[in-house]
């Protein structure tokens, strides 16, 4: 083998070793420095940042928004109300005449209202819990014992939000067959005023309500709760409130009169305060007479002009802002703002159909698990036994009418 060939092979092997020792990471991006567009340039878009705010942890702000802003109240309440509105259909071999006992138990314990409150505060604060209360099971730190659930012993749910004294502990459920696998095994109920522990609750007695789902590490940061619905909507809400406020402020300038007065600069710049006082008294008297009689007296040689502001285009701007808020809230404009659809021949039926499909999905993924967790306890309390074939079903939120069926 020649020296030249050997040298070439040596250099090739050396390059391969260098590549193995020092891998080079490459990134693809668009950049046009001459036009100042793209990655690494002085482009205005490149200056955009998305800082981590974690607004869910700001209890004061969330509470203030909920109490003072009607849009926030609608965002928190609309979806839970629709999820609960048609309730569920119970499928079981129990005779129909006994089903009213379950209905009476639901009314007695106000289970619908308690679930609504849990969903409200879970969506507002990112987390809430409903503690299952059973007569005779006073030690809440023990797992829920179905064998000791007697007829009439189910007392309902006690709803606590994440800032109202219930705190997940660090120990997690390790049983992979448990529905609460990888979630806290115990919750501490504490009196925040005194700092004393009221109760330690086993996870089998807790119904969890969370806002928006978070990745695992972010959920740990939020103490195993979720994200407030308001955090993803806040920026759009600020834009809407400012647009509405500015439009309202413009109404005060819709019709403005202004007066031309000769020598006004010398008059205002005069050092004689008596002259200035007389001038302001004259202007005040003119304004009062105009307000009372619709007439304004001016000096000979003065002139009065009127300007009117046109609001053309502002309704379109406001509509676009409302659409952004509705999109962030996952709720149609017609339901969130209580207004009819804008535009020629607009009915909003397509938006409502998509929304109701979304609600049907939430009932299956979120509400079903909650009800199936409560049903065994409620059945034992209402009937004294748990039917083996008991199941639930949800009626569609929107069913086709006669016209829709005929069109099909």
Descriptions of predicted regions:
Residues 21, 36, 68, 72, ...:
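Surface-exposed polar/charged interaction patches
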Residues 59-222:
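Structured, mid-chain assembly/scaffold modules that mediate subunit interfaces
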Residues 79, 185-188, 192-193, 304, ...:
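Tryptophan-centered motif/residue detector
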Residues 200-347, 395-397, 401:
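Extended, charged amphipathic alpha-helical segments
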Residues 1-85:
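N-terminal-proximal low-complexity accessory segments that begin disordered
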Residues 27, 47, 54, 63, ...:
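Conserved aromatic-histidine-acidic binding/catalytic patches
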